Amino acid sequence: EFALRHGQKPERIGLLTTGSSLLKVALHPAAAKLREAVAAIIANSLTWIDVQSLTDPINFYGSDPKKALGITAGKGPRIVRVRFRKQLGKSTYRSIKYNFFRVHRQFVYAAERRTGYSFHAILCGPQPLSEIAANGGLARRWPARKAPEGQHP
């Protein structure tokens, strides 16, 4: 909302929310300004991806932030569901799956396997957020170029 008020073009702005964490704050009665900001984001049709995981008991899995906040006009977020089990090796997944806080943080941790969701690839990679949202996740083969020998992509 700040960027819009300061002249940024809507097509150059995007929002990535993880674990439906926005709702943890926005549903509080005192969060009127946050709800107004979310309504402005929706009204301006900004690209917005909300990532959720069934494995995470702390997130609002299955929710639609736009509907949950009672916003009727505009386009809500593209909801992307991620399976941490597919992102992690068996031993890593086994070691974290009962640690609720560690599972919740997995949204922003590096993935051990390529999937359609990688926090770091979405924020720092070459693929535009609008393209990621349209496809429901990262391109199947990212990065587009091959990494030099001995380096991980």
Where are these predicted regions, by residue range?
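Conserved catalytic block of serine-dependent lipid acyl chemistry
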Residues: 1-5, 27
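Short, flexible coil/linker elements and helix-boundary hinge sites characteristic
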Residues: 6-7, 70
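Membrane-embedded segments
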Residues: 2-3, 12-15
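Lipolytic serine-hydrolase domain surface
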Residues: 14, 20-153
